[in-house]
Amino acid sequence: MTRAIRIAPSLLSADFAISRPRCPSDGRTGADILHFDVMDNHYVPNLTVGPLVCAALRPHTSLPIDVHLMTRPVDPLIDSFAEAGADMITFHPEASDHVHRSVQMIRKRGLKAGVALNPASPLSLLDHILEDLDLVLIMSVNPGFGGQSFIPSALPKIAALANGRRRACRGDRVDGGVNPADARALARPGADILVRLAIFGASDRAKAIASIRGAAESGLGQEAA
């Protein structure tokens, strides 16, 4: 059975000067998930948006909202984003004092829980937590800024995650610098969900999403071959 590739536009490139960024919704652009980047100017050197923006967007899209916490600490924000309408929360293990507790807090609220690994973070960080996770986010750029170039070392990490017992995690996703050429290479070793920053800035979002999805699916074809 062919794996389904899902595309997650990132709100980081949305135009917040308008009253409400035009959210992709089911059937209009082909997006599958809305990726919500949260930066605190402590864990990463940038500052973005918080739970109030998530709550304001929630009524305007039926897509699942995946909150990516690039914050330290993690735990105080979990309840706030759960109440704001998040469906998934992903955090960086280096930013949590007790990773298991953070995961348990997320799942107790009925949300999917994920861990994000920076480009230099080893997969061994997952060895004692993977069975409790719903997803793993592989960073193919360093967190904190948009517009960075894809870091190729993400590819062997994705392949290793997709094999053996590590595949117990249901959703392997990649965030950072993903263009159509990268999407093809990422899907082949096992990425299921691709986070794309530039979609909100595209003049034709449906076309931008179709381009990424088509490239990724061509990578799956090469995998099958």
Curated annotation (Swiss-Prot):
InterPro entries: Aldolase_TIM (IPR013785), Ribul_P_3_epim (IPR026019), Ribul_P_3_epim-like (IPR000056), RibuloseP-bd_barrel (IPR011060). A divalent metal cation binds at residues 35, 37, 68, 175. PROSITE patterns: RIBUL_P_3_EPIMER_1, RIBUL_P_3_EPIMER_2. Binds 1 divalent metal cation per subunit. Substrate binds at residues 10, 68, 144-147, 175-177. Pfam families: Ribul_P_3_epim. Its EC number is 5.1.3.1. It is an enzyme of class 5 (isomerase). The active site is at residues 37, 175. Keywords: Calvin cycle, Carbohydrate metabolism, Isomerase, Metal-binding. Its cofactor is a divalent metal cation. It catalyses: D-ribulose 5-phosphate = D-xylulose 5-phosphate. The keyword Isomerase applies. Pathway: Carbohydrate degradation. HAMAP family: RPE (MF_02227). Belongs to the ribulose-phosphate 3-epimerase family. This is Ribulose-phosphate 3-epimerase.
